[in-house]
């Protein structure tokens, strides 16, 4: 059990189980503490009755997204949690409802994401965490998460293939069904949920070598705008990859190649 479980015990002892069941839902009585974070105005720890909707938490308690940004998704349940989308904001947050959405209540993490978030990178980030946290006892978790992470890293580096998506799904199902413990069984959820709800972003990374959120640096391409180039030559002089050529008072050109794509230039 965790601290949240123990915190409920004194009140149940003092006021009884019947009182406790007046809060929340029939299948998930009581309250739940969430850590509200991400692209949201009001962050912090909140305690709400089980069955409260994500919409109420994000917009009424959290104050909506920062600077009026467009909502893209919310990751629920901690590092092994699933990602939900706009159509699922009215789903009640209780154990049964969340499980049906390929997510978990988990540690109560709620990470709100806007349109500037790359969902492929989100999956890679959390898979990196769960892979490092694997105890290594069972092969499905130890090797399965490692292989999934390798594929995700290849995709965000612009080296993915369409067949990788089928392999990711197969590995995710294998780890989920064959891992020995709860961490291993839930580890693939970020990948399963993002593949299901943001598959187009995966395909863009692979097919078009494009990250719509401009987060994956390996997929950034740089161009010189002829309307603003004055032919000063400073860009060519300062380019660490030596990928810019041109004469003074003439338009400079960027030679698109692997080194150029890897530069973290805004």
Region locations from a protein language model:
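Hydrophobic alpha-helical positions that pack around
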Residues: 1-50, 62
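Short amphipathic, charge-patterned alpha-helical segments
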Residues: 51-66
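Terminal amphipathic helices with adjacent charged low-complexity linkers/tails
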Residues: 66-95, 196
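Ferredoxin-type iron-sulfur electron-transfer modules in oxidoreductases and energy-metabolism complexes
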Residues: 92-226, 242-252
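C-type cytochrome heme c attachment motif
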Residues: 231-238
